[in-house]
C-alpha cells in the first residue's frame, strides 16, 4: 500500500480493551487518520459505509476514517459527521462512549493476508486503562449524553465485566432519562442491546436493576418492573448455567399471562423463538401453580400444548424455565419429560389393524391419544421405580 507518510492507522475500541483484560476479542475496528476516501479505494480498500466512509481490507477488517460528530437533532440518528483529513486520533477517540473503549494501538505493518501488526504502545488520552484496572465504567465526555444508546451500552459493559459505574456517569444517565433521550430509541435498537447483554453477561439481573435505578426500565419495559424482584434469583441461576437468551427472556416475563407475554416480546421485536418460549413458559407456570392435578389426561394435554411431540427442545427449555422460577416444580417437570419420552413413538402404526383400516380423521388422533394416556397411567403407577431427568 502506498499512502502519504502523514496517514496513520490504528486499531481502536474493543480489541485494545479486551487484550488488556486478557479476554478473547473478535472486534477488529480500525481508524485511519489523514486519509481521503479516494486514497483508500486506490489502495485496494472496498467502501461499505453509507453514512460515513468505512472500508474493508482483504482480511475483512473494517477501517473507518477518523471523524468527529456534532449533535443536530434528538435521538441516536441526530448527528452530523465530519471526516475531514484534519481530524486527529484524539478527536476521534473523544467522540466514543466510554474511556475503556477510547484506547488505540498503532498499526505498524500488514502481512500478505491483510492482518495488522501492532505497536505495543497503548494510546490512552482519557485514562481508560486506569478505569479498566479499577473496574470502573466512565464516560469520555458530556457528548455521552447526546446518544441514548450509550446508556444501554454502559450498563451492558458494567454487567459484562462486573464493573462499577462512576458516580458522574450514573448522574449523566439519570439526566438523560429525565430529559427524554431514551424515548427516541426504537424497539429494534433496544432489543439489540438487550440481546447482547444477555448473551455476554453473567449478571442479567444486575443489568435490569441498574436500568431500574436510573429510571430507564419504566420507559423501556414498564411491564416487567413490578415482577422484577421475583425473577432476580431465577435469573442469577440461569446466568450461572449459561442459559440461552430465550430462557432468560422467558424468566423475565414469567409472571405475566400468555397474551401479555406474547404482546410484550413482539412489541420489543424479539425473534419468534423468544416469543414462543416465553408464552409457553408463562402458560406452564400458571398451570403448575393454579390447576395442576397430575392426571394422565392432563399430562398429555399439557404435552400437546407444549408441542412436545414435534419440538422436544422447546419442551425441555420450557421445563428449564419453570424449574428456574420455582425448584418445587422439578418433580412435576420430570413427570412431564418422562411421559413425553415413553409416548413419543406412539403413532398410527401403534394402532390395531382394525383401527388402521376403519378409523378416519380425528378418530385416528383420538385413538393415538388413548394409547398415550394408557401408557402414562402405567408410568404414574410405577414412577417411584423410574429414574429422573435433570434440567
Q: Each predicted region: which residue ranges?
A:
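Catalytic cores of the polymerase beta-like nucleotidyltransferase superfamily
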Residues: 1-391
Amino acid at each position: 500500500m502506498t499512502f502519504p507518510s502523514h496517514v496513520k492507522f490504528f486499531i481502536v475500541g474493543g480489541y485494545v480493551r479486551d487484550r488488556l483484560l486478557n479476554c478473547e476479542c473478535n472486534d477488529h475496528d480500525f481508524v485511519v487518520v489523514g486519509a481521503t476516501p479516494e486514497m483508500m479505494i486506490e489502495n485496494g480498500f472496498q467502501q461499505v459505509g453509507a453514512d460515513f466512509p468505512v472500508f474493508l481490507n482483504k482480511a475483512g477488517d473494517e477501517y473507518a476514517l477518523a471523524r468527529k460528530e456534532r449533535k443536530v437533532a434528538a435521538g441516536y440518528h441526530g448527528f452530523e459527521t465530519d471526516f475531514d483529513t484534519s481530524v486527529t486520533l484524539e478527536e476521534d477517540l473523544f467522540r466514543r462512549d466510554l474511556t475503556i473503549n477510547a484506547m488505540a494501538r498503532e498499526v505498524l505493518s500488514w502481512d500478505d493476508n491483510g492482518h495488522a501488526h501492532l505497536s505495543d504502545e497503548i494510546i490512552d488520552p482519557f485514562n481508560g486503562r486506569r478505569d479498566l484496572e479499577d473496574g470502573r465504567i466512565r464516560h469520555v465526555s458530556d457528548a455521552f449524553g447526546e446518544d441514548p444508546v450509550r446508556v444501554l451500552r454502559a450498563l451492558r459493559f458494567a454487567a459484562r465485566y462486573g464493573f462499577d459505574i462512576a458516580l458522574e456517569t450514573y448522574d449523566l444517565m439519570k439526566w438523560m432519562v429525565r430529559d427524554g433521550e431514551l424515548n427516541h430509541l426504537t424497539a429494534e435498537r433496544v432489543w439489540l442491546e438487550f440481546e447482547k447483554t444477555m448473551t455476554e453477561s453473567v449478571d442479567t439481573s444486575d443489568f435490569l436493576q441498574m436500568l431500574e435505578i436510573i429510571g430507564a426500565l419504566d420507559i423501556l419495559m414498564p411491564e416487567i418492573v413490578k415482577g422484577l424482584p421475583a425473577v432476580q434469583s431465577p435469573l442469577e441461576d440461569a446466568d450461572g448455567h449459561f442459559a440461552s437468551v430465550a430462557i432468560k427472556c422467558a424468566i423475565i416475563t414469567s409472571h405475566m399471562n400468555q397474551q401479555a407475554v406474547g404482546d410484550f416480546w413482539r412489541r420489543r421485536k424479539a425473534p419468534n423463538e423468544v416469543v414462543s418460549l416465553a408464552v409457553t413458559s408463562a402458560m406452564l407456570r400458571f398451570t403448575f401453580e393454579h390447576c395442576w392435578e397430575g392426571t394422565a389426561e392432563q399430562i398429555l394435554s399439557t404435552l400437546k400444548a407444549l408441542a412436545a411431540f414435534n419440538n422436544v427442545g422447546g419442551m425441555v427449555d420450557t421445563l428449564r424455565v419453570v424449574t428456574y422460577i420455582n425448584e418445587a416444580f422439578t418433580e412435576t417437570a420430570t413427570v412431564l419429560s418422562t411421559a413425553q419420552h415413553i409416548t413419543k413413538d406412539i403413532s398410527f402404526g401403534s394402532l390395531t389393524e382394525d383401527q388402521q383400516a376403519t378409523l378416519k380423521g380425528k378418530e385416528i388422533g383420538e385413538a393415538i391419544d388413548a394409547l398415550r394416556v394408557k401408557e402414562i397411567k402405567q408410568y404414574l403407577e410405577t414412577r417411584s421405580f423410574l429414574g429422573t431427568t435433570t434440567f
